[in-house]
Amino acid sequence: MKHIAILKQPFFNMVLSGEKTIESRWSVNKIAPYQKIKVGDELFIKQTGKPVTVKAKVKNVKFYELNTSLAENIKTQYGKQIGIDKLKNWQEISKKKYCSLIWLGDVQEIEPIEVPRSNGNGWIILK
């Protein structure tokens, strides 16, 4: 399956530089990519308001139903690879109910691909 992840700065550049190797998605409801992405899937990555310019292969995934201590454990164990230190709203994020962790492999820049607007969604599943 193919997916598009929409990232803000500085996270987009962190993926390109290799500093960010895990994409995390935190939500109140079970929304994509929670339980919708798997190892081997192709992930296209775009910066907010711009075309897709990066693709990656999904190396690993983990899904969590959260509580406060589990969110803190994720922060401690994977925070550096996620780039949690760049988040301005960790207290709000740590109160979410679900977390998807997606390990990125074979990250490469590609020719720009225009995609339709996401209507505020940060994740799109391609059919």
Model-identified regions with their sequence ranges:
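Extreme N-terminal starter segment of soluble prokaryotic enzymes
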Residues: 1-3
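A structural signal for short, well-ordered beta-strand segments and their strand-loop junctions
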Residues: 6, 44-45, 53, 103
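A generic structural signal for residues embedded in beta-strands
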Residues: 23, 45-46
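Residues in well-ordered beta-strands of folded domains
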Residues: 6-8, 25, 59, 103-105
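Short coil-to-beta transition motif at edge beta-strands of beta-rich domains
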Residues: 34-44
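Contiguous surface segments at macromolecular interaction interfaces
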Residues: 26-34, 50, 64-127
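Short beta-strand-centered aromatic/proline hotspots
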Residues: 52-61
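Short, basic/aromatic beta-hairpin or loop at an interaction surface
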Residues: 7-25
